[in-house]
Amino acid sequence: KEYNNGKIIGEWVSLPCEGLEEVLHKISNNGNDELFISDYETDISNLKISEYDDILQLNEIAEEIDNLSDDEVIALQAYLEQYNDIEQALEEVRQGNYTIYYDCDDMSDVAYQVVNESGLLDGVPETIKGYFDYEAYGRDIDIEGTFIQVDNNIIELY
């Protein structure tokens, strides 16, 4: 009602917010006016918030995100690129359905880590190891899986 009459009442709120219900009650004219989100900022890449998202639900999601480890935040960003659905992305993170390959610029870096961690070339003489094609192996594992780059990390999603 107030909005339609040209009177906009709003307040910047950082989530999670303990007193959110009080703030919402105040800016909604004691619950008589519709609330909407006109702007937002987030450090979580690929997190999309729409104008009429449930602010109380967003507050709960923000609390959960605040409790995530750095690795879980990296995985969350990858899942958001894959699904664009925060609830589904958080569920996948909770289940731990990912592997993070750190400091990777491309899939050849991932291939190098996979080969070294798996011991794939253990027992192969050093003079022959130099001929291994990490770029080609990286292309092959990229085709076989789902890999998302977040900053300088590549995350494999299962």
Annotate each language-model stretch with its function.
Residues 38-40, 74-77, 91-93, 125-127, ...:
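Short coil/turn segments at secondary-structure boundaries
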Residues 20-84:
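Structured domain cores in non-transmembrane regions
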Residues 2, 111-158:
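Acidic, proline/glycine-rich low-complexity IDRs
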Residues 14, 36-39, 149, 156:
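Residues in well-ordered beta-strands of folded domains
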Residues 102-107:
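Short helix/strand-capping turn motifs
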Residues 1-32:
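N-terminal ordered "arm"
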Residues 81-97:
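Structured, non-catalytic alpha/beta "coupling" segments that mediate domain-domain communication
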